[in-house]
Amino acid sequence: MGDNVFLEPDPWASSSNWGSPVKPLNYKTAIGNSSIPLQYRNYWDVFQANNVLLFPEEESYSDIFHVPQDVMKEFFTLIESSSNQPLRQIQFFVLLALVACYQLGVPSTLEQIFKQRNVLPILQRFNPELFNRSSDNETPLFPNNSPPASTTALNLSSNIVPSINESKILEQEDDDVSNKSLPHAQQSIIRSFPDIQKQPKGFFSYPSSTVSSIAPSTLEAGNLHSQQPPKFSVDSSVDDNAITPRKPFSKIPNRLSPSTQPLLSNSRHSSFRLASSSTSFPASLEMNVDIDLEPSGYFFYRHNNYIISDSSNTREVLRRYSDFFWLHSYLMKKYPFRRVPLIPLKKFHFAKRNASTQNSFLEHRRQELSDFVNDLSHHPIFSNDEVVRVFFTEPNVFKNWRRENQKRIDQEIEQFLVVPQSQVPDASETVKERLLKLNMSTTTAINNQLNIFRIFEKMIFTLQHFHEDFLRLQNSFNCLLDSGLYHQVFTSTFAQNESKIMSMASGHFYNIDSLLHQQNDAVKHTFLLGLSKEIKILISLRLLIERISEVFSTDLTKVRHTISNDENLLRETANSDESGRNRTFLNRSSKKRAENSLKSKKELYLKNLNQRYQIAHELEQELSYLQDYVFSLGNPYVEYCKQHVKLEEESLKIWHTLESDFSRLET
């Protein structure tokens, strides 16, 4: 989670011609820790070579980037530039990012950018090494009535998405320039600035062949993340394909079309066919869940959404808590004999207008949802489920998608759960014994893990009290030093010696307090988080055992005996009718009821027998998957011990340093 820099509304936004921007609290925060694109650094070298261009002149920059002067004036205000001093490097980078976002057209205001990714910085929204996949079905970035601009305008929006060579990006009208080195090409940009300044102002325009019409659904709030920057060129010699708009969700399922995705009814493991070609979900990627601090909805329906992205930032979707809850219910219904990860319980939460990452409820739910999605993404079966893949990749509102496809999803679940009418071996004895051992071991492990968790929570509480004590110690030492007591009462030599001792002790306790802070963070963020993940995994395993135990509550021996008795009764009745005897075992209505009862008992027996056989197979798979996942998480005890040993070694060094300082004073 980054710092939210767009919480302060801009009082002059109403008089702005650039929509309703929101002024960042600090432009330095806007740059954050994100990686600066290589092209931005190249432009910095180019502009630095010409000292005149580094001065924030609205007219010059407006002509270079084809941005209105009033907008450029707002940009200079945002980066806190001065007209009589050249731009610093960080100011220049932020300016390029703002210009790039403006050239994108959608979104067109900082407020909309904030809604897309409230944990800005702006540059962090776009990774220069990733969004390289093209898409022909992209909405236009600018209205059709935008004034045409020269193709020689320096467009920075694709600097965030460099998908062609730098030599081609910096290509001039002369064909031989593209074969030259990058610094020489950069110098050619400087030479082309006078020509650029003569061009008429306006937006950067795209050929009509590369831009499709705007669909109303693409402008919904849930689809804000699908708008991505295009490629660009500073010269008209670059072909039109170089400026095809791109987005991070280019090769993912958009929605399930009933006309193009028939169900595979002959297969038990049938799945949806996607309307567009979709890549397999990367199960090895770490998933991140962030809180969207901008609430959605009105009045009592106001809520906070959650931003799901993978570690490579190639995908980013917006989901509500109800979407997570629906997905959990879907998995429980479709995979009753597999370990479904835990999800935080439903609880009413009124989203405040200005949410904060310090909200304990939101942070606790975010952490649990993060564990949920990571457990899903590492599960070989769940990660390949089509509904799960759509959940992680569908950029539109997931609630609308699942409503449109609810009937087809229900049919898919019914076909998946159809029990084959075939005899399978009885796996009751082996599974029962395994379940008994698993139930005892998981219950014992959960109880012990919870006890350890509580003990370390008490340790954190104790460390916080130590921190308060050390603060009081430092204040006492500082008061002694500031009062000048030793210099007023005792001789100068003795007073200087005592003052040095007090200063050393104060510095020593400050260092110890810093180590306690590190130890506190190590317990909180390393050990307790890892331990809580293991506890939730064990609880989900125990819930799986409880669901499986319900299947074994049916006594198949009694069912077999009743089936045998009913068959004998019907056989005797049939023989009596054939022999023409006066006595009949069953009349016609009773015989019909007996036949129906026998049929239902046989179906129950076959279903239970197949379920036990399925459990025996899937239980071994789940334990194998669980072992691999826990191994990938790492042992929290080992990580904590490593950090604790490191901190203890640093603490020992501090004590040795203090001892050597005291020994030097005595000598």
From Swiss-Prot:
Entries under PROSITE patterns matching the protein: PX (PS50195)
Region of interest: Disordered: 221-268, 574-594
Main location: cytoplasm
Protein name, entry field: Sorting nexin mvp1
Function comment: Required for vacuolar protein sorting. Component of the retromer-mediated endosome-to-Golgi retrograde pathway. Required for efficient cargo export from the endosome, promoting Vps1-mediated fission of retromer-coated tubules that bud from the endosome.
UniProt note: domains: The PX domain binds phosphatidylinositol 3-phosphate, which is necessary for peripheral membrane localization.
Family from the record: Belongs to the sorting nexin family.
Biased composition (Polar residues): 224-236
One GO term describing the cellular component: fungal-type vacuole membrane
Residues annotated as binding a 1,2-diacyl-sn-glycero-3-phospho-(1D-myo-inositol-3-phosphate): R320, S322, K346
DNA-binding listed as a keyword: no
GO molecular function, one term: phosphatidylinositol-3-phosphate binding
Quaternary structure (record): Homodimer. Forms an autoinhibited tetramer consisting of 2 homodimers that self-interact, wherein the membrane-interacting BAR surfaces are sequestered and the PX lipid-binding sites are occluded. Interacts with Vps1.
Ranges where the PX domain occurs: 279-398
A GO biological-process term: retrograde transport, endosome to Golgi
Disulfide bonds: none
Classification via Pfam families: PX, Snx8_BAR_dom
Family annotation (SMART domains): PX (SM00312)
Keywords, ordered alphabetically: Cytoplasm, Endosome, Membrane, Protein transport, Transport
InterPro entries the UniProt entry points to: PX_dom, PX_dom_sf, SNX8/Mvp1, Snx8_BAR_dom
UniProt entry tagged with the keyword Cytoplasm: yes
Membrane topology, from the record: Peripheral membrane protein
Protein encoded by which gene: mvp1
Localization: Cytoplasm; Endosome membrane
